[in-house]
């Protein structure tokens, strides 16, 4: 079993969607994905060329947003970092596909910490 650890950025993103966007079912919507990750199923697509270290891989996975009634294609995107040797998965960020214009064009999620954007 993997340990799934939400980063401070991920928790901040969740709070934003609950408070500002009023997506009250976000926890239920992503629960299936976090359960899969705990079982060691690295769901989603690996993002090549985006590395934090040589020991892990970054993935992007789609999730439904039941608050918008628009399915997975316009649902959430979750970026996570998997370290197989340590059996740990760090949830990096979550964003709504409807808000993807807030994601920088170079493909990196915006982060407040300039040296290590995924400080854990």
State where each predicted segment sits.
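Short, surface-exposed coil-to-beta transition loops
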Residues: 73-78
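Short, well-structured beta-strand
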Residues: 80-92
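Basic, Lys/Arg-enriched alpha-helical interface segments
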Residues: 1-72, 85-86, 96-120
């Amino acid at each position: 079993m993997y340990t799934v650890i939400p980063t401070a950025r991920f928790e901040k993103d969740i709070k934003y969607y609950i408070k500002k966007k009023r997506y009250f079912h976000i926890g239920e919507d992503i629960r299936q994905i976090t359960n899969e990750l705990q079982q060691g199923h690295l769901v989603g697509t690996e993002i090549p060329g985006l590395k934090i270290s040589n020991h892990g891989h970054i993935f992007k996975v789609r999730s439904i947003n039941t608050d918008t009634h628009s399915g997975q294609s316009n649902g959430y995107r979750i970026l996570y970092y998997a370290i197989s040797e340590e059996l740990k998965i760090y949830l990096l960020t979550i964003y709504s596909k409807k808000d993807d214009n807030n994601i920088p064009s170079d493909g990196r999620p915006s982060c407040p910490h300039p040296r290590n954007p995924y400080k854990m």
